[in-house]
Structures are given as structure tokens and as C-alpha cells.
């Protein structure tokens, strides 16, 4: 197959767009902030098809299962994996902040902090209890779930729909074939929309730099650097070890999904790359049923980057305000973070709301301390989203391997750049 000119490769276009966005935001901030609709529009185009794609993928995957017990088995293994790896992420964030101490030296008096800027986040977090979260999974109507784009609600509907089709067998084949055909159409739409990724990345990055400015990063560079370094260590060491045990290289896997990562980098939303990630994982040898169950669930239950961020941000605020936390308080923080992190999603800003929910149950630390990181949260959200998407990709491969539904030949071909897996134009490799 003839190799594309480098300027036609999607990830090259996205890199160029991000660089141009940074330059425009730095030198022409007023004009750059007007570029926000470009980023918002791209994310809306992607979110437009996320719900239907999840529904169709899960339904066809479950409908094709001969053993319905497999649905519960796959879900159980995925949740077990999520909890174990999420705990590692929380502990790593805690340990890194203790070792590098990014908040030491600020010496801020909590009484001087104005909490008005974070009041809206605190209000949203206050209403998020575990019971509310579980009840929220049940939609008011099927139509409402799709209209609001609620991933877990759509997943619940798809599980029920697919289970009934599997029970019907041949009698439901017409519906299954229709949904399978619809899946192909939806991924075709994604391929078209993905071509607009450079425009979306340019708009989102230009707005971010134009609104907040590079200068806003300087006082808190140590925290940003600590977070990025910790996330890299998590991907290379924790996820890298898991990948090696499973039989693949984390470096090659990251390279394989580089286009999706660059889209996430430009938009700060891991949801922006969800459809492409699901397709890439199928092409890498993961079964459709496992992809359909693990990836959407992971977007609420397996947010490794958000977990690192939460424990690190809480300890940073404590260090900056000279508040000492006992080990018992830190263990309580871990336990609470395990619950509150499940309410976060792949959308920009959700991590900050989750942080507010976590701080609310640690009364020693003032909620107003969140203003210290409000200005840089937007710059940290990119790293959160990047870590989240890599974590969900690795989780899907691992669960597929556990289920013995991983085509290792396809995986090897995908990660080494050989074979048929790169024939799809959207793959860009």
C-alpha cells in the first residue's frame, strides 16, 4: 500500500494544529478566545454518535454470545481490574506528593482564600451521593438516555436489549443484523468527523492559552510537573508491567493509539476519542463484546488519571495551607476517593467537581483551597484525559486476554505496524 505524504497523516495535522493554537493564544489572546466554538463543535460532533455507537456495539456483542453468563463474568473481571488499578493510581498520587512536596513553601492562610470562585463546583459535588449515582444509572426513559448522552444509562439499556436478542436467537436475527449494519454506518460517520480533529484541536488549544495564558502556569509549575511526571510513571511502570505480563509493549500500544491521544490532548476530553478507540481495539484483536462492555464502563469506573489527580490535589492544598493530615485521615481520603472518582466522566471539568466532592468529607482542609488550582486545572485536564484513555485501552486488552478472546496475531500486527489492521483510513498509520 502506498504510504501517505506526511502532511496528510492525521496525527501530524493535529500536532501542527496544536502548535498553531498555542502560538495564536499566546500572541493574540483576544482572537484566540473566539476560536472556542471550533473545539466545542468538534466535541459535539463526536458526542453526537457516542451514545448510538456504544448501544450498537454492546447489543451486537452480547447478542452474539452463546453463554449469557459471560456478560456477568466479563463485567465482574472488568470491575475487579478497575478497582485494583484505581487503588494503585490513588496510592501513587499520594506517594508522589509526599516525596516531591509541590505545595511546601506557599504558606497560605486559609482565612485569606475566597471560595466564591469554586462555590458552583462545591454545590454540584454536594448533591452527588453514592445512592444518587446508582439511581442515576437508571434513565427516566430510553429516549432521555440518548438525548442526554448518559453513557452508563445507554450501557444499561444496551445490556438489556442485547440480552433479549440473545434469548430470542434466530427470531431476533433481523434486528441484530440491522443494528450491526447501523454500527458500520456510525463508524463511517466517525471517520468523516475525525478528519476535522485538527480544527477542533486548534480551536480548543487556542482558547485555553488565550484565556488562561502561559503566565498562569508559572507559580504552580511544580504541581503541574509533579502531576505529569507521576502520570508518566503510572503509564510506564504500572500499566507497563500489566501490559508486559499480558504479552504486549505499553510503548507500542501508546504509539498505536497516538492519533486518539493527540485528539484528547487538543480537546482535553477523553470522550472525544471514544469511538475511535473502540474501533482501534477491535482491530487490535479484542473481541467486540469485550470492547463494548469494558470501554464504556471504564469511562466512569476506570479513570486512572483522575485518581492520581485527586489524591495529589488534596495533599497539595494541605501542604500549601500548612495543614498536617494524619495517616488515618489519608486512609479516609483514599476510601472516599475510591467512591467519588466513579462519578467522574471523560468531560473537561468533571475532575474538578469530583475533587470538590472528595474535599467535602475531609473537613480539615478548607474547600476554598481549591481556588489555588482553579486557574491551572484546565492545563492538568489534558494529562488526566490522556492517562484515562491509555488506562481504558490497556484494561480492554487485559480483560480480552483473561477471557481468551484476544487475537494475539492481530495485536502483534497492530502494534508493530504490519498486517491488515492499518488499512482503515482513520487509523492513519
Swiss-Prot record:
Principal place of residence: membrane
Membrane-protein topology: Multi-pass membrane protein
GO BP term, example: L-aspartate transmembrane transport
Pfam families, alphabetized: SDF (PF00375)
GO molecular function list: fumarate transmembrane transporter activity; malate:proton symporter activity; succinate transmembrane transporter activity
Transmembrane spans: 9-29, 45-65, 79-99, 149-169, 185-205, 223-243, 308-328, 356-376
Keyword 4Fe-4S appears in the UniProt entry: no
Descriptive protein name: C4-dicarboxylate transport protein
Gene3D superfamilies named among the record's database cross-references: Sodium:dicarboxylate symporter
Annotated GO CC locations: plasma membrane
Keyword Membrane: yes
Cellular compartments annotated: Cell inner membrane
Family to which the UniProt record says this protein belongs: Belongs to the dicarboxylate/amino acid:cation symporter (DAACS) (TC 2.A.23) family.
Annotated organism of origin: Burkholderia ambifaria (strain ATCC BAA-244 / DSM 16087 / CCUG 44356 / LMG 19182 / AMMD)
Record keywords: Cell inner membrane, Cell membrane, Membrane, Symport, Transmembrane, Transmembrane helix, Transport
NCBIfam families: PRK01663.1, PRK13027.1
